[in-house]
């Protein structure tokens, strides 16, 4: 039997300001640290917290690499910031970081390669409680990550032997002026003016495969957010949306901070785009941006551009954490 091929997709260390930036001795090899910069934090507890986050992340990477080294696998690792090509010729992608790292890797995957997320730095509730009056000590959420350092080998073995099967999650597809954009969003997209203080002007309607259209809604607002079922627990929920079953192929949309909507328009500013529908958006600002799963992937748009948003995208195979598999809504 051919040896299976695994890609280890890593969160970089430059998201953790090292202690050396504050003038103290570095705790980690120079090769793992970003170029020195001025860290304004002086609270020793903040510095110790940042130092520990980097250490925990490094320890998790070391553990994952050690586990892979001891198995009959062909594997290689890459930092997410150094990757820009479609992922091919592998049997499994393992991300080490949090949800952001998993989302970044998903942009390079089609529906054929499964992905397993390892939360390298989970939040410690006791730490959060102890430091609540000083700073926010929450770490990585890892909502879609099935593994941590504590159970990585167990989850990996179950994935490789087929006893832990990946789930297929819906993604968002977008066409710009009829041309398919190459990125599919696993969580959500945001369409807005690039300046958050500026008004976004656009109109939208929903259209079915049979050609039936809803009424046109003209908007002045802070933008448009569209989420998948997986993304409905993130920014969409924070903005007042609702959680969708992970198996849903529908999309949820919400107009952000609408300006003086009419009474007839108000019920239409938040709703669902069904699987057999797509949303047509016409942009009326001189400039605009479409953000895919956060701020890293951005497409520019301009006045008169038409966006077609739908769930007509290849699904993503994700090894989900146990608590999501056990949800009754699934």
What are these regions (language model features)?
Residues 91-92:
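Structural motif
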Residues 95, 117, 226-227:
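Redox-cofactor binding/interface segments in oxidoreductases and associated redox assembly factors
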Residues 105-121:
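A short, gly/pro- and small-residue-rich
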Residues 2-12, 31-40, 47-86, 123-225, ...:
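Catalytic phosphate-donor-binding core of small-molecule kinases
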């Amino acid at each position: 039997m051919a040896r299976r091929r695994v890609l280890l997709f890593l969160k970089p260390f430059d998201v953790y300001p090292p202690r050396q930036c504050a003038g103290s001795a570095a705790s980690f090899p120079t090769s793992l640290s970003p170029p020195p910069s001025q860290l304004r934090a002086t609270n020793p507890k903040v510095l110790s917290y940042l130092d520990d986050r980097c250490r925990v992340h490094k320890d998790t990477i070391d553990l994952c690499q050690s586990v892979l080294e001891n198995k009959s696998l062909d594997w290689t690792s890459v930092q997410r910031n150094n990757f820009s090509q479609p992922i091919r010729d592998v049997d499994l992608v393992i991300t080490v970081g949090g949800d952001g790292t998993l989302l970044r890797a998903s942009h390079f995957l089609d529906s054929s390669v499964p992905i397993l997320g390892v939360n390298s730095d989970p939040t410690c509730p006791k730490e959060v409680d102890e430091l609540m009056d000083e700073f926010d000590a929450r770490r990585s959420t890892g909502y879609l990550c099935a593994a941590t350092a504590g159970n990585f080998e167990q989850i990996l073995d179950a994935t490789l032997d087929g006893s832990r099967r990946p789930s297929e999650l819906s993604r968002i597809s977008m066409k710009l002026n009829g041309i398919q954009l190459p990125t599919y969003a696993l969580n959500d997209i945001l369409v807005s003016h690039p300046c958050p203080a500026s008004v976004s002007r656009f109109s939208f309607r929903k259209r079915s495969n049979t050609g039936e259209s809803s009424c046109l809604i003209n908007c002045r607002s802070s933008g448009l957010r569209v989420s998948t079922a997986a993304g409905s627990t993130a920014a969409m929920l924070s903005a007042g949306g609702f959680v969708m079953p992970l198996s849903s192929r529908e999309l949820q949309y919400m107009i952000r901070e609408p300006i003086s909507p009419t009474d007839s328009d108000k019920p239409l500013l938040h709703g669902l785009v069904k699987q057999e529908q797509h949303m047509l958006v016409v942009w009326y600002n001189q400039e605009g941006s479409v953000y895919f799963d956060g701020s890293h992937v951005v497409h520019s748009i301009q006045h008169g551009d038409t966006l077609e948003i739908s769930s007509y995208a290849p699904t993503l195979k994700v090894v989900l954490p146990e608590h999501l598999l056990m949800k009754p809504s699934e």
